[in-house]
UniProtKB/Swiss-Prot annotation:
PROSITE patterns: RIBOSOMAL_L33. Pfam families: Ribosomal_L33. SUPFAM superfamilies: Zn-binding ribosomal proteins. One of its GO terms (molecular function) is structural constituent of ribosome. Gene3D superfamilies: Ribosomal protein L33. This is Large ribosomal subunit protein bL33c.
Length: 65
């Protein structure tokens, strides 16, 4: 049986460049879902991932649900 809250959280990462870029291929904002360990990573997660709307690798930041 598990005690307390789960350590792993499911989070959403959103592209920081999509809202500022007028030369996008598609409309919308790129979002990825992933999980993080609450004990090891307490601050907000930032990863460099590919954005299909911008067609480049950009920084994706964790957003609130």
């Amino acid at each position: 049986m598990a005690k307390g809250k789960d350590v792993r959280l499911v989070i959403t990462l959103e592209c920081t460049n999509c809202s500022q870029n007028p030369n996008k291929r598609f409309s919308g904002i790129s979002r990825y879902t992933t999980s993080k360990n609450r004990r090891n990573t307490t601050n907000r997660l930032e990863l460099k991932k590919f954005c299909p709307q911008c067609s480049v690798h950009t920084i994706h930041k964790e957003i609130k649900k």
